Amino acid sequence: MEVVTVTETSTETDTGTCTGTYEVVVIGGGAAGLSAALVLGRSRRRTLVVDAGEPRNTPAAHMQGYLTRDGMSPAEFLALGREEIARYGVDLVRDRAVDVTKGEDESAGFAVALAGGETVHARRLVIATGLKDELPTVPGVAERFGRDVIHCPYCHGWEVRDQAFGVLATTPMSVHQALMVSQWSKDVTLFLHTVAESELADDDLRRLAAAGVAVIPGEVAELAVEDDRLTGVRLTDGTTHPREALFVAPRPVPQTGLLEKLGAELQETPFGAYPVVDPTGLTSVPGVWAVGNAMGFGEQVVNAASAGYRAGATINGELLMTDLDAVVRV
């Protein structure tokens, strides 16, 4: 197994080897997973991060709203995080966890199989696998996503303020998105796309009118792009409406495969099925925590980091008390 170790003073990586047994294995190397690993490393816990290298916010050039890191690129943020965990002896392997099994009892821990063929063992697991965004299948949306096709006004609204906004409706809930983004621009058009106007509640229509949001029925055919920038939204009837930024609502797809293999209880929400967790992220499977977007939709980077921190501190305390109780019982 190739393990990446990052020195405190360099962004270069060296490879080394390690044994396959850890106190905690963190699956996922985003903000939530790295934050959990940082706390655990500082708590002197032997910890491994398994990082498949597929952060959700890769399409975005910058991340916003994270105090002291506002405007930083997601790649730079994660590179700094990897440097920080390495200072405390945390290992990181560039690989994907493809299977996970639990022992016959809690003391037996967990076995994590990696795509590279190795298996590592842990007393506790942190699942930080996040979610994937399933975008509307309109030509141009995927290509522009994270640039001038965006989904979160708190993440990107300031950068496109006062521009001509479009909102691509995929469900009646898109009305809420159109109303929200009107805080950042007074030129907002809601393209109903696959939503019939009859599906909108009367109260929603009144709110849209009060906010000055224009409503245009008709299916969107494609985005108009010139000189590598969005210039408009083209309908199937051939009309093009000039727009500079388009808000969409991707369908979140929780990455719960490993949790399901462990038998974790999931609950259905309007945004997918997520694990049932306590306030620390502990799932229904003893010894397994879920953090960040692995435990719920809508976790911003700062929230995900907070969830990872909370889980890491909880796991350290839980391991300490478990070991002390074992001595007392003897």
Language model features by range: what are they?
Residues 8, 22-76, 164, 173-198:
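Beta1-alpha1 glycine-rich phosphate/pyrophosphate-binding loop at the start
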Residues 37-38, 175-179, 291-330:
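A conserved FAD-binding loop/helix module that cradles the flavin
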Residues 6, 132-179, 184:
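Glycine-rich dinucleotide-binding loop and its adjacent helix/turn
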Residues 7, 143-159, 252-302, 310:
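FAD-site-proximal beta/loop scaffold in flavoenzymes
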Residues 42, 46, 52-54, 61-88, ...:
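N-terminal glycine-rich dinucleotide-binding loop that anchors FAD/FMN and/or NAD(P) in oxidoreductases
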Residues 79-114, 119-122, 185-273, 320-330:
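A Rossmann-like FAD-binding core segment of flavoenzymes
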Residues 30-31, 133, 172-173, 295-296:
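Residue-level detector of alpha-helix initiation sites
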Residues 1-22, 79, 88:
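Extreme N-terminal leader/targeting segments of oxidoreductases
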